[in-house]
Amino acid sequence: MTHYSVTLKNANAKELADKIEKILIEEVPPQEKISFERKVGDADAFLYVYERRYPLRQKGIVTFNVLITDDKKETTVDVSVSGLQGVWKNKTGEQFIEFVKHGIRDYEIKL
């Protein structure tokens, strides 16, 4: 599993979620199965799940999870990729995370 977490200052969780969703939609080929699940809790949490299912000769599932939580003071983005690596448009989990980092580069990272 590949994991990345970053805490941001002055970020809007919904705007951030929309931006990451746009990255996923643009990077996932239209013929692939893509599903988004948005859950909003007390702390404005957004959870995105993407799964790619393989043909029978290549059994396996790759799942991308993006969890965005916002407690009004700071916003945290957690990204994890599990399953077989290197199969989502020939990209590894690390490369997918680079897409996410690219999408949030305009925000101020809390050190």
PLM regions: where:
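Terminal, regulation- and interaction-focused segments at domain boundaries
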Residues: 1-32, 36, 109
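Ordered hydrophobic segments in well-structured contexts
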Residues: 5, 35, 46-50, 63-67
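Hydrophobic beta-strand residues in large extracellular and virion-surface proteins
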Residues: 6, 20, 68, 77-79, ...
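A structural detector for beta-sheet-dominated domains
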Residues: 9, 50-51, 69, 80, ...
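A short, structured loop/turn motif at beta-sheet edges
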Residues: 13, 39-42, 68-75
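Amphipathic, interaction-prone secondary-structure segments
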Residues: 41-59
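Beta-strand/loop substructures that line and gate deep hydrophobic ligand-binding cavities in soluble
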Residues: 56-91
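A conserved amphipathic terminal alpha-helix motif
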Residues: 84-111
